[in-house]
Amino acid sequence: MITIEQLLDILKKDHNFREVLDADGYHYHYQGFSFERLSYDSRQVDGKTLFFAKGATFKADYLKEAITNGLQLYISEVDYELGIPVVLVTDIKKAMSLIAMVFYGNPQEKLKLLAFTGTKGKTTAAYFAYHMLKESYKPAMFSTMNTTLDGKTFFKSQLTTPESLDLFAMMAECVTNGMTHLIMEVSSQAYLVDRVYGLTFDVGVFLNISPDHIGPIEHPTFEDYFYHKRLLMENSRAVVINSGMDHFSFLADQVADQEHVFYGPLSDNQITTSQAFSFEAKGQLAGHYDIQLIGHFNQENAMAAGLACLRLGASLADIQKGIAKTRVPGRMEVLTMTNHAKVFVDYAHNGDSLEKLLSVVEEHQTGKLMLILGAPGNKGESRRADFGRVIHQHPNLTVILTADDPNFEDPEDISKEIASHIARPVEIISDREQAIQKAMSLCQGAKDAVIIAGKGADAYQIVKGQQVAYAGDLAIARHYL
């Protein structure tokens, strides 16, 4: 429960309070209200709900519906003049985060918080950290792929970083379940829209940066994207940073006065020997590590997670065991066909991650290589040119372009846009299952491979704003082995 007095105190301390408006005019102080629930969904309110009117598409009609369901007061940046009191604020998203934090009993103070950011690798690194910490502690995890609040049951995540009301409710459930640590992926969008406003992480990890999520509904420029990624560093007590990433010198200067540790080529924490399924490291994680996920970049993700977990109480033995146990749904999953050709299923969904995926496969498979690829509709439009550029640099690839969450766009138009950046012929098969079947039918022997990129473990396609059932790349590939 939270009272109106507590609520106003939170807003005033954050300089986010304008006034309370009701039929009698303006009020600096207010009383007589207490709330047992928080909501930003007008369909889920009653007389004891504190409702947040948020979003560029919010309509007064939503509020009218809530009032008919008993709503007595709401928080907003706008007075909709509907006859009930309104708490007016300058920034509704910041208000949501700080109020939710207090309403749910400040769960962030009862958990050790570890956050990963980066253009790619967040989910893999989060899974590594989860398995490392699980050796001696009780970690919960919020990731793009799956969320667990109790370490036993997993459910599909809706957002990389949940909305603040959901985030703190879930954190409180983690505390109730006896969890000791929480591992999170923190997206640039989470900072852009203040989902984690007011939250300080025990350790923040910056894996890498490359142009992505740049478009009309995301970040307008790379500078804006990079700035919002860096906010995790400002909001972490200690940081772990990849010294091999672009703009590392800037980040090193930024965190000079913070507790920090670097890994990669310009640091003392490096991988000294790398094999397909093992590596040796020097520095704080010196030792031998077995790993199921192939690729040097996955070994670096394991290093990043290990350095973070070392600070959070994990032993080197915990880290070694955790790395050896980690598998990630939809990340570098490998199947073998009856003719011994390989099928690689991976979530690679931007130019940089596609380049790394192709390089790893080419290292191990020297025959005919088939790539299945698409790009999402109505977001990250810059990826299409990036995909074309990467494919152009791998002339031995046979390419089939297909649907990948086309949303409100025509998947064939998206494929044609990607193809316009490739200087050789490619095939377009918009039905993703047919594209996979065709590619697999072209494999003849153990040196050949099909690379299915983009959707990973997703069992849906986003079409016209809705999630439409889709068997999933892995399930389809298994069917045609």
Curated annotation (Swiss-Prot):
Disulfide bonds: none annotated. Its main location: cytoplasm. GO terms for cellular component: cytoplasm. The modification N6-carboxylysine is found at residue 229. Carboxylation is probably crucial for Mg(2+) binding and, consequently, for the gamma-phosphate positioning of ATP. The keyword Cell membrane does not apply. A motif (L-lysine recognition motif) lies at residues 404-407. Keywords: ATP-binding, Cell cycle, Cell division, Cell shape, Cell wall biogenesis/degradation, Cytoplasm, Ligase, Nucleotide-binding, Peptidoglycan synthesis. Its EC number is 6.3.2.7. ATP binds at residues 118-124. It is found in: Cytoplasm. It is an enzyme of class 6 (ligase). It comes from the Bacteria. GO terms for biological process: cell division; cell wall organization; peptidoglycan biosynthetic process; regulation of cell shape. Gene3D superfamilies: Mur ligase, C-terminal domain, Mur-like, catalytic domain, MurE/MurF, N-terminal domain. It catalyses: UDP-N-acetyl-alpha-D-muramoyl-L-alanyl-D-glutamate + L-lysine + ATP = UDP-N-acetyl-alpha-D-muramoyl-L-alanyl-gamma-D-glutamyl-L-lysine + ADP + phosphate + H(+). Catalyzes the addition of L-lysine to the nucleotide precursor UDP-N-acetylmuramoyl-L-alanyl-D-glutamate (UMAG) in the biosynthesis of bacterial cell-wall peptidoglycan. HAMAP family: MurE. This is UDP-N-acetylmuramoyl-L-alanyl-D-glutamate--L-lysine ligase.
